[in-house]
Structures are given as structure tokens and as C-alpha cells.
Amino acid sequence: WIMGHMVNNINQIEEFVSLGANSIETDVSFDKKANPEYTYHGTPCDCGRDCLRWEYFKDFLNGLRKATTPGDAKYREKLILVVFDLKTGSLYDNQAYDAGKSLAKNLLEYYWNNGNNGGRAYIVLSIPNLAHYKLVTGFKETLKDEGHEDLLEKVGHDFSGNDDIPDIESAYKKAGVTGHVWQSDGITNCLPRTLKRVILAIANRDSGSGIINKVYYWTVDKRSTTRDSLEAGVDGIMTNYPDVIADVLSEAAYKDKYRIATYDDNPWETFKA
């Protein structure tokens, strides 16, 4: 999965997919009542990027729905996965459940079109704080209450705070999550970071007894870091330059080992070579 980083404006969806992304990451900020309000990152952000692009969340979901609904003029077949980077840092811990509830209602109405030929992309809810695990509970219970439990098949999870993996496993246990787990590791492109924790996450993924199904590394803009990530065995690379990642994937060392995921590849299944 080539994951376009910080895609917060509808026009950027097309831009990143054209460069080779089959997945995008979108920042979601919340208002004081725990309702998702904007797709917005703000400053500071990655070096070399405009941090201030934004949409209202509902408008972004409408644009995203069009880009992922077969038959729509804006449809882009390659775009199969969306990571919502949920900026819950502005919320009190006790608002996490409500944030999940509101997020589910928004996605149901504006992205899934109330279950009537909505967008088809898989969705990862990425939460920066383990204490906010109730966001997952609120999200799941709301979809069930609304009669759309089937849509949970399209939803996965990530805790993005670079926490210790046993702590992440215990947060999932509290949230009642047993699968559909992506694990991120990384840091802004302005700073270097080793692959130490990525390697631990991959070991958990491949152990057969861990909770992790997929591992992605962010933010990777250099060819050398891309190669290191592929050597380690990641499933996804988040980047500001999808064309760089696509380029490296076509190199002799990788083109037979890796391919770009399509809609038929289940993002919740651990890949077995």
C-alpha cells in the first residue's frame, strides 16, 4: 500500500492517486463537542508541505465517496484504503466515545450513503492515544444501532502513538478489537528514526499469536528509507511522494517480491509469502 500523506483537500485526492498512491491518509480535527469538523493538519507539519490545506469533514467525505464509488465521474479504481488520522489530542479522555459515535454517523451519511452504493474503500481509524480506545467502542456500537453492522467489515484500527506493543494489545482488548489491525510506526520526515520498532511490530505480525495484521511506516520520502522499509518487510509506506515509492517498487530487487495492492487484496489479512 502506497499511502499518500496528509491528503486534506478534495483536489489532493486526484493529485496523490495520479502520482501512484492506492491509499491516502487524512487528518481529522474535532470541535469542542467531539464532532469531526475539518480535515486539517495545521502547523507544524512535514518539511516541504503546505500544512494549511483543509475541507469541512462532511465535504471531504462527499468528495472521497465520489472518488471511491464505481460509476462516478470522479471514480479512481486504484484508491482502496483511507487512513483517518484522528486528532483526538484536543478532546478530554471522556469524550472519546462520543467522538467515535459522531464519526460513525458522519461516515454513514456522507461516505457510505446510508449503505446505498456508497464509497467502497477500506477505512482505518487511527488513534494517537491509547486512553481513547472508547472511540472504537462508540464507533462500532453506533453502526450496530443504525442497522449497519455489516460496514464494520470495511473498518480497521491503528494506534499511532508509537507505544509499546503489549500496551497496544491491552488497549485493543479493552475495546473488544480482535482483528483488522494495522500498526503504524514513524515520525515526521524532518527527523530520522530507526526501524527498531517496525521490526518488533513485524515480528508480532508474523508470530501468528500477535494482534497485528499489517505494518506501515511513515513518513518516507527517500529512496534509501524506502528500500530499508521494504527489506524489513512492511505492508505499507506512507509518503509525501508516492512516485518515489512506486519507482523503488519497480527496481529489480523488489519487483518480484512486492506488488501494489488492489481492491481484491484483503487489508485485514496477514500476508503469508
Swiss-Prot record:
It catalyses: an N-(acyl)-sphingosylphosphocholine = an N-(acyl)-sphingosyl-1,3-cyclic phosphate + choline; an N-(acyl)-sphingosylphosphoethanolamine = an N-(acyl)-sphingosyl-1,3-cyclic phosphate + ethanolamine; a 1-acyl-sn-glycero-3-phosphocholine = a 1-acyl-sn-glycero-2,3-cyclic phosphate + choline; a 1-acyl-sn-glycero-3-phosphoethanolamine = a 1-acyl-sn-glycero-2,3-cyclic phosphate + ethanolamine. Mg(2+) binds at residues 25, 27, 85. Its EC number is 4.6.1.-. Binds 1 Mg(2+) ion per subunit. One of its GO terms (cellular component) is extracellular region. Expressed by the venom gland. Its main location: secreted. Keywords: Cytolysis, Dermonecrotic toxin, Disulfide bond, Hemolysis, Lipid degradation, Lipid metabolism, Lyase, Magnesium, Metal-binding, Secreted, Toxin. Disulfide bonds join 45-51, 47-190. Belongs to the arthropod phospholipase D family. Class II subfamily. This is Dermonecrotic toxin LamSicTox-alphaIC1. It comes from Loxosceles amazonica (Recluse spider).
